[in-house]
Protein backbone atom coordinates (compact mmCIF):
# COMPACT_ATOMS: atom_id res chain seq x y z
CA UNK A 1 0.00 0.00 0.00
CA UNK A 2 2.80 2.44 0.81
CA UNK A 3 4.52 1.72 -2.52
CA UNK A 4 1.27 2.38 -4.40
CA UNK A 5 0.86 5.66 -2.54
CA UNK A 6 4.45 6.65 -3.38
CA UNK A 7 3.91 5.93 -7.08
CA UNK A 8 0.65 7.89 -7.19
CA UNK A 9 2.25 10.82 -5.34
CA UNK A 10 5.17 10.86 -7.78
CA UNK A 11 2.85 10.84 -10.81
CA UNK A 12 0.68 13.59 -9.28
CA UNK A 13 3.74 15.75 -8.57
CA UNK A 14 5.04 15.18 -12.09
CA UNK A 15 1.68 16.11 -13.58
CA UNK A 16 1.47 19.27 -11.48
CA UNK A 17 4.97 20.35 -12.48
CA UNK A 18 4.86 19.58 -16.22
CA UNK A 19 1.23 19.17 -17.22
CA UNK A 20 1.91 15.56 -18.22
CA UNK A 21 1.91 12.38 -16.16
CA UNK A 22 4.88 11.11 -18.19
CA UNK A 23 7.13 14.10 -18.89
CA UNK A 24 9.78 12.03 -20.69
CA UNK A 25 7.39 11.43 -23.61
CA UNK A 26 8.00 15.05 -24.66
CA UNK A 27 11.60 14.18 -25.59
CA UNK A 28 10.79 12.33 -28.82
CA UNK A 29 9.75 15.37 -30.91
CA UNK A 30 12.86 17.22 -29.74
CA UNK A 31 15.11 14.37 -30.93
CA UNK A 32 13.50 14.51 -34.38
CA UNK A 33 13.94 18.28 -34.52
CA UNK A 34 17.57 18.00 -33.47
CA UNK A 35 18.26 15.33 -36.09
CA UNK A 36 16.69 17.55 -38.76
CA UNK A 37 18.79 20.51 -37.68
CA UNK A 38 21.99 18.44 -37.79
CA UNK A 39 21.17 17.07 -41.25
CA UNK A 40 20.36 20.56 -42.50
CA UNK A 41 23.66 21.94 -41.18
CA UNK A 42 25.61 19.07 -42.75
CA UNK A 43 23.92 19.59 -46.11
CA UNK A 44 24.64 23.31 -45.94
CA UNK A 45 28.31 22.74 -45.14
CA UNK A 46 28.70 20.10 -47.88
CA UNK A 47 27.08 22.39 -50.42
CA UNK A 48 29.34 25.26 -49.37
CA UNK A 49 32.49 23.09 -49.61
CA UNK A 50 31.49 21.91 -53.08
CA UNK A 51 30.82 25.48 -54.23
CA UNK A 52 34.20 26.56 -52.89
CA UNK A 53 36.07 23.86 -54.78
CA UNK A 54 34.17 24.66 -57.96
CA UNK A 55 34.88 28.38 -57.55
CA UNK A 56 38.57 27.75 -57.04
CA UNK A 57 38.82 25.69 -60.22
CA UNK A 58 39.52 22.43 -58.42
CA UNK A 59 36.59 20.57 -59.95
CA UNK A 60 35.88 20.44 -63.65
CA UNK A 61 38.35 22.96 -65.07
CA UNK A 62 42.07 23.70 -64.94
CA UNK A 63 41.81 27.48 -64.85
CA UNK A 64 43.39 29.35 -61.97
CA UNK A 65 40.34 31.25 -60.79
CA UNK A 66 40.84 33.45 -57.75
CA UNK A 67 38.43 34.61 -55.10
CA UNK A 68 38.88 37.82 -53.16
CA UNK A 69 39.74 37.60 -49.46
CA UNK A 70 36.50 39.37 -48.61
CA UNK A 71 34.59 36.20 -49.48
CA UNK A 72 34.02 34.42 -46.15
CA UNK A 73 33.36 31.06 -47.80
CA UNK A 74 36.71 31.24 -49.59
CA UNK A 75 38.43 32.10 -46.31
CA UNK A 76 36.74 29.15 -44.65
CA UNK A 77 37.88 26.79 -47.40
CA UNK A 78 41.47 28.07 -47.28
CA UNK A 79 41.55 27.60 -43.50
CA UNK A 80 40.21 24.07 -43.90
CA UNK A 81 42.76 23.29 -46.61
CA UNK A 82 45.75 24.69 -44.67
CA UNK A 83 44.68 22.80 -41.52
CA UNK A 84 44.46 19.52 -43.42
CA UNK A 85 47.81 20.10 -45.16
CA UNK A 86 49.50 21.03 -41.88
CA UNK A 87 48.36 17.86 -40.15
CA UNK A 88 49.22 15.61 -43.09
CA UNK A 89 45.81 14.82 -44.55
CA UNK A 90 45.63 14.55 -48.31
CA UNK A 91 43.37 17.13 -49.91
CA UNK A 92 41.11 16.39 -52.87
Swiss-Prot record:
The keyword Secreted applies. The keyword DNA-binding does not apply. One of its GO terms (cellular component) is host cell nucleus. It is found in: Secreted; Host cytoplasm; Host nucleus. Induction: Expression is up-regulated in spores. Transmembrane segments: none annotated. Residues 54-75 are annotated as: Disordered. Its main location: secreted. Keywords: Host cytoplasm, Host nucleus, Secreted, Signal, Virulence. A motif (RxLR) lies at residues 48-51. Residues 1-21 form the signal peptide. Coiled coil: none annotated. Secreted effector that suppresses pattern-triggered immunity (PTI) in plant host. Has the canonical translocation RxLR motif, but lacks the canonical EER motif, which characterizes most oomycete effectors identified so far. Belongs to the RxLR effector family. This is Secreted RxLR effector protein RXLR-C02. It comes from Plasmopara halstedii. The lineage of its organism: Eukaryota, Sar, Stramenopiles, Oomycota, Peronosporales. The gene is RXLR-C02.
Amino acid sequence: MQFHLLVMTTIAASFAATGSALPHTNVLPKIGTLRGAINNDAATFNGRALRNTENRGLIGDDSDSSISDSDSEAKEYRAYKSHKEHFGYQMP
